[in-house]
């Protein structure tokens, strides 16, 4: 629903505080805003630590890291925009000096939320390309992959966000588009995972081992594809769940209901988006042992405790038991020599 109060433009979860005051709900609204501030503070701390892990701890391929940092970048802009909006809504701008900044913040937040809602397919495309270039993807950064994905993704999302803001397309069309894109991204990762599993098993078949038709780098990349598809499947479930919830709330703009009901749905959306932004990094963290190891190292450093060595694990993070290290080493290098001679 385009609002006359916003010059015939539509922003995601734009709440007119004048209407809230007229309804006598200012105290409740202010309380909810203060609770939201608490969530925002936690989100900032979480974001800064996540950024540190992305920069200094290599836990995935460069392209996947770059795409996740792009995902985090939109959340940073979204949080910054939301902080400006909340600051004004808490009554810190009685003379409306921040009017232009509020419009910019609403515009930026709407665009960033569109990026978050369309994000799933970019991870799917990156993993599909990693599967296609399996022979040398890990050895080469292939920066062009992430740049190509983002150069196509951002203009399309930006155009969609502008169409939403300018009321060129009905809300229901945007919501249907969100659903379709998210489902395609979710199914695509499952297909990519199944393909890599099948190919990985084929490489370990007796016929393939005897013919030695694969290289160690290719086998490693396949294992890496499978591992990261597992990680993405966990992250995707949370993204899909929250995207469906947020998109469903946006449908309130499509129906003729009381303005107060719409505003309460917007409040729910804001909290839903915050929980979304807090939960996804936690799920990603829980799926990456490298990040967990770095966190333990930092905690031990803070409390002055010596870091404890860890038992070796397999490619897929499973515990490995060595009864005789010499025998295990001989087996490994025997297999290595077979593939190189």
UniProtKB/Swiss-Prot annotation:
It comes from the Eukaryota. The chain crosses the membrane at residues 37-57, 64-86, 101-123, 143-163, 169-189, 235-255, 264-284. GO terms for biological process: sensory perception of chemical stimulus. Keywords: Membrane, Transmembrane, Transmembrane helix. It is a multi-pass membrane protein. Disulfide bonds: none annotated. It holds the Pfam family Sre. One of its GO terms (cellular component) is membrane. InterPro entries: 7TM_GPCR_serpentine_rcpt_Sre, Serpentine_rcpt_epsilon. The keyword Transmembrane applies. It is found in: Membrane. Its main location: membrane. Belongs to the nematode receptor-like protein sre family. This is Serpentine receptor class epsilon-8.
